[in-house]
Amino acid sequence: MKIIENQGKQITTRQAESLLFRDFRRPLIEIMTDLRKPIQPRFIKHKTIKGRKINFVSWYELNRLMDFYAPGFEWNINTSFDGTKVCVIGALTIKAQEGDFTRSATGNENSDLDAYGDPYSNAEAQAFRRSCARWGLGLHLWG
């Protein structure tokens, strides 16, 4: 492990790389151009709901793509429950050279449905996918 000096403090090369990437910000127009590109087919999954074939990308794959195109992005949620339905409002913030920019979306799930996962994580995943689409990521799948 190599030790280097940064602002009078000794840190490892791994810590230096972390600082470099944490402070890295791209121009917003470049980020948005990349996010609007169609997602590669290897990330796209398929499921059938009520007889219709649906194309989708898992939230964790979208998370990886966001890490690649918009390093340092932030995801914040607020949840509510009315007794039968969970609602999540998610805010996806991109850190660009020009500043921080946020777009929000909602996700919801009935609490009594027998679905994979739990209502809260399903609603959050839906809000995240929708927030990504508001930035252009995966938007071509919604049409």
Language-model-detected regions and their locations in the chain:
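N-terminal, Lys/Arg- and Ser/Thr-rich interaction peptides
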Residues: M1-I54
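Positively charged, aromatic-enriched nucleic acid-contacting surfaces
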Residues: K50, V57-G143
